[in-house]
């Protein structure tokens, strides 16, 4: 006997996240009351997570093209040409809400999902990165969330067999009720063997691949498009459950299948599951899709059409198959022990038709499920400008040596070794620069060429001045890639914001995108993929605006990649870039002086490019022994990191024309520290002058301590103890 679907009522519509005007739009579009299954389909396809209804208008203004861009936004992942017939495929995506509800599985399936986005394009994953934001350390849930998220990321990546090579982790009370878990994956493919999601051909079979479908993750995308209240625990069933070993089998089976020529189009079943993947493939190819859900492999009995369509069970793919190669394709998946089921076909009707148990459960216009989704030009208000804080107006509460010692043992600046040692960053044997440097560096194959990878954002800058913060997020990623000697090539972004229905939040979003676009254009650093995560809000309070940037650069010879560690005594230490001593929104002002205030440091994009290009040439010419960009904590923290990494001390001096605490801890942008031999230092200084690059000698390496002239020397061993001690002590509940 056919099951009875619930009646579509205003309450049911509201529970699906659809506003009254959006429901009226559905009625006008299809000319009738939708079935329960159709309501679920619209809810999935028109939610913020899938439709980008609040952000699409502004995303269009971002720069996405360059001669080396093969595929920009709109596919599973972005693709760039990296030479020698190879392409780099990469994307960053959020799994914020699920990771707060169930940190281990939420983070693990975030990794699994982004890996599928990459290998769906025909690329073999070679690296993962992440960007994590947790609440205040003293918040009662923070330890639990850190522990679960880190374990989930490590478990999935390690089991799947891809190294997690880099990331960025910080803490702030603004994330108490909404943590951020942004996962990035990078893969390598032949540039002429990229696979896309666009279906072609009428009557071609649609094939379900991978794991069986269960009830986990139903309405995961809808949940990710809503603000959190106090009922987060009740949403636990919306969190997917991952199996990295099955995903590894799926990877190998898909790559083998792609070599047979059987694949016409392929799409990961991610957010909104079977619904989204089927609709996207059909709509991109201007084709209809007809599904027979009786053929869907299920691991639970009695699943309804609604449940099968909206399940976000992991490790699943949907493919349009060349009908002449069905037997060959099936044999591949049988060999790998995975499901292979023909569940439908392409049609010329431009309709999305779903059948189950002899009934038509859905019959909808396929293009309108995506193209007719609401598109909002939401009201937005620019953030008020904050005044510049002069360093001379700040009374230092500690000596500069004391402030440095304090900063190195703070949650944001301390070593994250406790985190990255839970990730296998060597599993493929391709890691050249391991976690802890400016950017991760991996070797490609047996040759000298490599990739540099980084994730960056400074939310306190974005909150104080969204445009400047957006510029800085991109500039910081570009600078980190440059600091290891890479040529920055492209960006993936992950835009994490609060409720876009609030004009001040939408203003943050628009401002950050303005700054991001300006920086990407100025630095020739196009955006090729990304993700938007809105409604990161709990109890009416949004998170700090966090537009995460994932950067990818190419290194011609990884043997020349620069490292941040001081290598030997007697080297000259040179500071590249102008230093005014900018303390507004600095960690010194926040963690030493107890103030979050002032305008953030401006980013002069012309100076950023000029200084970075100069540093990259120094690295290529092998003129420097160590390089480090200057960011959080300023010059003194960067020097300490270089000294601790190499076990070599330094003696450095501030100029008389900048207040000392501003010189050591100001977060002025576009700056690097380089170390070079004394005999080369004069040549570097002269070359900088010719290039119009500010460069000054501030000291030399040597000894077992870091000495800021006029201050007590601090032993490197003491700095390291503070730097390495905070996070393990915190996680052991010793603080």
Curated annotation (Swiss-Prot):
Disulfide-bonded cysteines: none
Principal location listed in the UniProt entry: cytoplasm
This enzyme's EC code(s): 6.3.5.3
Residues bound to ATP: 52, 91, 493, 530
InterPro entries cross-referenced by the UniProt entry: PRibForGlyAmidine_synth_PurL (IPR010074), PurL_linker (IPR041609), PurM-like_C_dom (IPR010918), PurM-like_C_sf (IPR036676), PurM-like_N (IPR016188), PurM-like_N_sf (IPR036921)
Active site: 49, 95 (proton acceptor)
UniProt KW ATP-binding keyword: yes
Transmembrane feature ranges: none
Subcellular location: Cytoplasm
Protein name: Phosphoribosylformylglycinamidine synthase subunit PurL
Residues the record lists as binding substrate: 94-97, 116, 240, 312-314, 533
NCBIfam families: FGAM_synth_II (TIGR01736), PRK01213.1 (NF002290)
Source organism: Methylocella silvestris (strain DSM 15510 / CIP 108128 / LMG 27833 / NCIMB 13906 / BL2)
Keyword Transport: no
Entry's family note: Belongs to the FGAMS family.
Pathway recorded for this protein: Purine metabolism; IMP biosynthesis via de novo pathway; 5-amino-1-(5-phospho-D-ribosyl)imidazole from N(2)-formyl-N(1)-(5-phospho-D-ribosyl)glycinamide: step 1/2
The reaction(s) this protein catalyses: N(2)-formyl-N(1)-(5-phospho-beta-D-ribosyl)glycinamide + L-glutamine + ATP + H2O = 2-formamido-N(1)-(5-O-phospho-beta-D-ribosyl)acetamidine + L-glutamate + ADP + phosphate + H(+)
GO CC terms in record: cytoplasm
Keywords from the named record: ATP-binding, Cytoplasm, Ligase, Magnesium, Metal-binding, Nucleotide-binding, Purine biosynthesis
Function as written in the Swiss-Prot or TrEMBL entry: Part of the phosphoribosylformylglycinamidine synthase complex involved in the purines biosynthetic pathway. Catalyzes the ATP-dependent conversion of formylglycinamide ribonucleotide (FGAR) and glutamine to yield formylglycinamidine ribonucleotide (FGAM) and glutamate. The FGAM synthase complex is composed of three subunits. PurQ produces an ammonia molecule by converting glutamine to glutamate. PurL transfers the ammonia molecule to FGAR to form FGAM in an ATP-dependent manner.
């Amino acid at each position: 006997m056919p099951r009875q679907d619930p009646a579509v009522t205003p309450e049911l519509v509201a529970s699906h996240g659809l506003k009254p005007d959006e429901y009226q739009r559905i009625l006008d579009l299809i000319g009738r009351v939708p079935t329960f299954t159709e309501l679920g389909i619209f809810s999935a396809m028109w939610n913020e997570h899938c439709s980008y209804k609040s952000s699409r208008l502004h995303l269009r203004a971002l720069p996405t093209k360059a001669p080396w861009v093969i595929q920009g936004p709109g596919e599973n992942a972005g693709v760039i040409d990296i030479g020698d017939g190879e392409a780099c495929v990469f994307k960053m995506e959020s799994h914020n809400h699920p990771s707060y509800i169930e940190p281990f599985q939420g983070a693990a399936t975030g990794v699994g999902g982004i890996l599928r986005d990459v290998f769906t394009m025909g690329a073999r994953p070679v690296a993962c990165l992440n960007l994590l934001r947790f609440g205040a350390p003293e918040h009662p849930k923070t330890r639990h969330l850190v522990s679960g998220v880190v374990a989930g990321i490590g478990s999935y990546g390690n089991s799947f067999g891809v190294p997690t090579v880099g990331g960025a982790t910080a803490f702030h009370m603004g994330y108490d009720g909404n943590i951020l878990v942004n996962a990035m994956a990078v893969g390598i493919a032949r540039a002429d063997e990229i696979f896309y999601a666009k279906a072609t051909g009428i009557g071609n079979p649609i094939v379900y691949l991978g794991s069986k479908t269960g009830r986990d993750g139903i309405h995961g995308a809808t949940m990710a498009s809503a603000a959190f209240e106090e009922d987060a625990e009740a949403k636990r069933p919306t969190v997917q459950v991952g199996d990295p070993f099955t995903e590894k089998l799926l990877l190998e089976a898909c790559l083998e299948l792609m070599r047979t020529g059987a694949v016409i189009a392929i799409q990961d079943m991610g957010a909104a599951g079977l619904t989204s993947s089927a609709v996207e493939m059909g709509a991109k190819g201007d084709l209809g899709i007809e599904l027979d859900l009786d053929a869907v492999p299920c691991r639970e009995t009695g699943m309804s059409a609604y449940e099968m369509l909206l399940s976000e069970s992991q490790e699943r793919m949907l493919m349009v198959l060349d009908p002449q190669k069905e037997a060959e394709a099936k044999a591949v998946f049988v060999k790998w022990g995975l499901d292979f089921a023909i569940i439908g076909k392409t049609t010329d009707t431009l309709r999305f038709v779903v059948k189950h148990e002899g009934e038509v459960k859905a019959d909808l216009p396929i293009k309108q499920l995506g193209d007719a989704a609401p598109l909002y030009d939401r009201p937005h208000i620019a953030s008020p400008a904050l005044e510049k804080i002069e360093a001379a107006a700040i009374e230092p509460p500690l000596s500069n040596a004391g402030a440095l010692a304090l900063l190195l043992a703070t949650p944001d600046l301390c070593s994250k070794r406790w985190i990255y040692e839970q990730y296998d960053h060597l599993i493929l044997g391709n890691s050249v620069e391991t976690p802890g440097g400016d950017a991760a560096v991996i070797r490609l194959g047996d040759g000298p060429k490599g990739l540099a990878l980084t994730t960056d954002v400074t939310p306190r800058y974005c909150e104080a001045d969204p445009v400047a913060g957006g510029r800085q997020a991109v500039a910081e990623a570009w600078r980190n890639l440059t600091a290891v000697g890479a040529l920055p090539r492209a960006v993936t972004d992950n835009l994490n914001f609060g409720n876009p229905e609030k004009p001040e939040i939408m203003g943050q979003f628009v401002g950050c995108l303005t700054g991001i676009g300006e920086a990407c254009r100025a630095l020739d650093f196009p955006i090729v993929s990304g993700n938007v995560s809105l409604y990161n809000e709990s109890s009416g309070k949004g998170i700090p605006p966090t537009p995460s940037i994932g950067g990818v650069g190419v290194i011609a010879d990884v043997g020349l990649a620069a490292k941040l560690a001081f290598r030997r005594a007697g080297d000259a230490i040179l500071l590249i870039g102008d230093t005014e001593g900018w303390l507004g929104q600095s960690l010194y002002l926040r963690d030493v002086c107890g103030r979050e205030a002032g305008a953030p440091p401006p980013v002069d994009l012309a100076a950023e490019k000029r200084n970075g290009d100069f540093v990259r040439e120094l690295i290529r010419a092998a003129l420097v022994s160590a390089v480090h960009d200057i960011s959080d904590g300023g010059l003194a923290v960067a020097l300490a990191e270089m000294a601790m990494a190499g076990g070599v001390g330094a003696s450095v001096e501030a100029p008389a024309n900048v207040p000392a605490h501003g010189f050591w801890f100001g977060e002025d942008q576009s700056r690097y520290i380089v170390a070079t031999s004394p005999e080369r230092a004069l040549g570097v200084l002269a070359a900088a002058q010719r290039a119009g690059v500010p460069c000054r000698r501030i000291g030399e390496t040597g000894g077992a301590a870091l000495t800021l002239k006029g201050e007590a020397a601090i032993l490197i061993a003491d700095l390291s103890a503070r730097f390495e001690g905070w996070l393990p002590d915190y996680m052991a509940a010793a603080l």
